[in-house]
Amino acid sequence: MKNNSIKAVVATGIGAALFVIIGMFINIPLFANTSIQLQYAVQAFLAVIFGPVVGFFIGLIGHMVKDMFAGYGIWWSWVIPSGLVGLGIGFLRNRLHVEKGIFSTKDVVTFNIVQVLVNVLAWGVIAPLGDIIIFKEPASKVFVQGLLASVANALTVGVGATILLAIYAKSRTQAGSLSKD
């Protein structure tokens, strides 16, 4: 158990650092303060490997630190959904078996259905409502931002994390794959 705790802490730290670095240096603008964010593919990948708690803290800590470095203050209405994305996708840890070298077509479909639903809920609903409640932002603006972020993040995770998970699964040794000559 202690070893798993250490792995979780290390994965959280590395994941949050990658979240910040990728988020600060690799983004493609789409709409007012909304861009394609490649760090969500890495967060989703690590969430599936290490579970919902690690996924949550990668997004929460990573997004918070990224906002601090960006200089415009912490937008909690978007930081919290980043954590929730990792949390939601992380619940797939026990359903998918990439650690055992398995990432079937059914697993790819399951992963992508879940990540699309999680992204739509986080960015299309929770983030815009947070902007309206916390920052008094106009609903017409924030729901457009949320919709664009939902689509961009779902596509980013759908392509990027699916590739990362497939590569990772292929790198694992499947049970019974080794035989004595």
Curated annotation (Swiss-Prot):
Presence of keyword Transmembrane: yes
GO cellular component: plasma membrane
UniProt entry tagged with the keyword Transmembrane helix: yes
Listed transmembrane segments: 8-28, 45-65, 72-92, 115-135, 147-167
Annotated compartments: Cell membrane
Its membrane topology: Multi-pass membrane protein
Coiled coil: none
Origin superkingdom: Bacteria
Keywords per UniProt: Cell membrane, Membrane, Transmembrane, Transmembrane helix
Principal place of residence: membrane
Family designation: Belongs to the UPF0397 family.
The protein's name in its UniProt record: UPF0397 protein SMU_1935c
Organism of provenance: Streptococcus mutans serotype c (strain ATCC 700610 / UA159)
